[in-house]
Regions:
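Outer-membrane beta-barrel proteins and related beta-barrel translocases across Gram-negative bacteria
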Residues: 1-446
Length: 446
């Protein structure tokens, strides 16, 4: 059996209660019964209960969170920790003086698991920020102190059960927006937007700290300008670096429509970063990879997005992606894409959803791996929509992410508009699988 409960209650405009919990009777349930095509790649189910409260200066959160591991190849020691409970608070006080803000972030979490190290982590970060800006530029300086303490159990003999890490975080951020009119009629606006962020975080030895919920995200333009290269409180990356970026946009003067956006970014290290996660390689380089992004929306109904990551030390590309989309109306779309990540992924992806008439629409997707020289995923489907009900049927053939075997599934969903639906949640699957997909609009009553 499968149970999926989602419920949100607002006690007042500033208080929200949330329950989001799922459970299956056995690990193979999704493969055997196909409850939603996306279920074939799920490794664990989330069980969350949360309360949030917002006031003028404070945001408060309390939650408990557990997971049901349903991937038989994933051991309990590799799965996520149970959170029993977590209490977090974020306070902000603006304009204490001209341009001066203050903040306080605090979090206490009890991490539990059947095997390995568990315990309580308390993370506190007070900070101040000052910002001065004009119409075309800004300068922002930030200073924070981050202290993290642990009370651990089931540690290795001789290990510290109450480690503590404390350090300052200093940053100086600045940017400029330069503009000029271009085009024969001066109806286009080109911008040049350089940005620089200097970040200093002293080194603290963190090899003895556990890893409860911390990871290093893939490098991107957002990551270049964060004050911590890790997500999660178990690691704070040391830094003595300068991140530089520049963006240029082409805009319509009258309506503000963006035709083109191009961005380059790179970080320059004055000292080698030394903080690492257990499986993270040693960093010995003077710069980060070079990141480039291009977004083109100049042509009616067409859009394109390009991304590229270049490793200057190895003189090779680490990541590249190209996505094209043709969308002449909200109910019709064609996508084509290419994605490459060194030693991991190289694949083509083509998808489409197109009306056959006022009530019928066809759709499909094909994903092919160039590295493995085989089709990873393909499906075709039909959708019928009227004023009162909709019917969707999808046939799919794909490589299982769990076993590597080829699986075949057929999904059927009947939706009574405004009431409920019966069968697999194929609409949610289609929204995830086809960029720009939206359900057919309701046909008029006959």
């Amino acid at each position: 059996s499968y149970v999926d409960l989602k419920h949100v209650t607002f006690l007042d405009p500033g208080t929200r209660l949330l329950v989001d919990a799922a459970n299956v009777s056995d690990d193979r349930y999704f493969e055997n019964f196909g409850v939603g095509f996306e279920g074939t790649s799920i490794t664990y189910l989330n069980r969350l209960a949360e309360a949030r409260r917002h006031t003028q200066h404070w945001s408060l959160v309390g939650r408990v969170q557990d997971y049901q591991v349903i991937d038989p190849d994933l051991s309990n020691s590799d799965g996520p920790y149970t959170i029993l409970p977590q209490v977090a608070a974020l306070g902000r006080w603006r304009n204490l003086a001209p341009g001066l803000d203050a903040s306080l972030r605090a979090e206490a979490t009890n991490f539990a698991r059947d095997t390995g190290v568990d315990g309580v982590r308390v993370d506190v970060e007070p900070g101040i920020d000052w910002r001065a800006e004009s119409r075309a530029s800004y300068v922002a300086a930030g200073a924070a102190w981050r202290a993290t303490s642990y009370s651990l159990s089931d540690t290795e003999p001789g290990s510290d059960e109450s480690p503590l890490r404390s350090l300052p975080i200093l940053s100086l951020d600045s940017g400029v927006v330069l503009e000029r009119e271009v085009g024969s009629k001066g109806n286009r606006l080109q911008t040049l937007e350089p940005r620089a962020l200097y970040l200093y975080v002293p080194y603290r030895d963190q090899d003895d700290l556990p890893v409860f919920d911390t990871a290093e995200p893939d490098l991107n333009l957002v990551q270049l300008f964060r004050t911590n290269r890790y997500v999660g409180a178990d690691r704070v990356g040391d830094a003595n670096q300068l991140s530089l970026g520049v963006t240029s946009r082409l805009l319509d003067v009258a309506g503000g429509r963006q035709y083109l956006s191009a961005t380059l970014g790179q970080a320059f290290y004055f000292e080698d970063p030394r903080v690492r996660l257990p499986d993270e390689p040693v960093r010995d380089r003077s710069t980060s990879d070079l990141i480039a992004e291009l977004e083109l929306t100049a042509f009616k109904n067409w859009s394109a997005r390009f991304g590229y990551q270049w490793d200057p030390d190895a003189s090779q590309s680490e990541r590249s992606e190209v996505y094209l989309q043709y969308r002449p109306a909200s109910d019709r779309v064609v996508n084509a894409g290419y994605r490459f990540r060194r030693d991991l992924v190289e694949q083509f992806d083509v998808s489409a959803a197109w009306p056959l008439n006022d009530r019928w629409r066809g759709y499909g997707r094909w994903v092919y791996s160039l590295a493995e020289e085989k089709t990873l995923d393909q499906f075709v489907g039909l959708e019928y929509g009227s004023c009162c009900w909709a019917l969707r049927v999808v046939a799919r053939r794909f490589v299982s992410s769990r076993t590597g075997d080829i699986d075949t599934s057929i999904g059927l969903q009947l939706e009574l508009k405004g009431l409920s639906s019966v069968g697999t949640d194929s609409e949610a699957f289609l929204r995830d699988a086809i960029r720009g997909y939206s359900a057919l609009p309701s046909a008029p009553r006959p």
